[in-house]
Each structure stands twice: as C-alpha cells, then as structure tokens.
C-alpha cells in the first residue's frame, strides 16, 4: 500500500488506526479503532506459524517489516497472546488461533508493543 493510501485509509490525522485491527487467519479482533499509533521501525519477524513453533527459535526464516501499529500498554489489546521469551523478545500472536507472530515486544522496553500492518487485516 502506498504511503498516501495508507494515511487516508488506515491512519487518522492524529496518526492512530482508523479501523479495527484483525487477525488475518481467523478474523479475531486484535485492536479497537483509535487505540494504536502508526510507527515506522524496521523489525525482523519470523515467518507466520503456530505459537509452539515460534519459541524453539530453530527457523530463522522471516521478514524485515517497517510499518507497525504501536501500542504502549498490553491491556489495550483485545485478543493477543505472547510467546515465551525468545532472547529479550516476546512475539505477539492471535489469542484465538495462535498464529503469529503478528507483532513484537522487546523486554527492555515495557511500554512498546508493535503489530505489523502486513500481518493483520483491517475492518
């Protein structure tokens, strides 16, 4: 999606999500509209798979993603689970179908939770 399209369709003038954020696989609601800030930061996320396969760390395949929703409090999420620690990172997964990672949380920064726009859908 082009930056201008992104700004108009998904990001409000205040930089917040205009639409609800949903799991791409099962449609479960991850975030309500207006609860996250748009952020550009390069983060590596492993390829999408079920939660138990994420914590073994044996599969380095994945993507460097740049566009994210930034949430500063884990209790803002509607339906998100967290993996066990993988180094100093916890990956975010859908709490209903356990597919992920849809996002990333560094344990060094207690107030930053990133959800990759490419790993979720919007409604």
UniProtKB/Swiss-Prot annotation:
Keyword terms of this UniProt record: Acetylation, Guanine-nucleotide releasing factor, Metal-binding, Protein transport, Transport, Zinc
GO molecular function: guanyl-nucleotide exchange factor activity; zinc ion binding
GO cellular component terms, A-Z: cytosol; membrane
One family name in Pfam for this protein: Mss4
Domain MSS4: 9-123
Tissue occurrence: Ubiquitous.
Any one of the GO BP annotations: small GTPase-mediated signal transduction
Residue numbers of N-acetylmethionine PTMs: 1
Alphabetized PROSITE patterns for the sequence: MSS4
Binding site for Zn(2+): 23, 26, 94, 97
Family per similarity comment: Belongs to the DSS4/MSS4 family.
Quaternary structure, from the entry: Interacts with RAB8A.
Function: Guanine-nucleotide-releasing protein that acts on members of the SEC4/YPT1/RAB subfamily. Stimulates GDP release from both YPT1, RAB3A and RAB10, but is less active on these proteins than on the SEC4 protein. Might play a general role in vesicular transport.
Protein name per UniProt: Guanine nucleotide exchange factor MSS4
Gene name linked to the record: Rabif
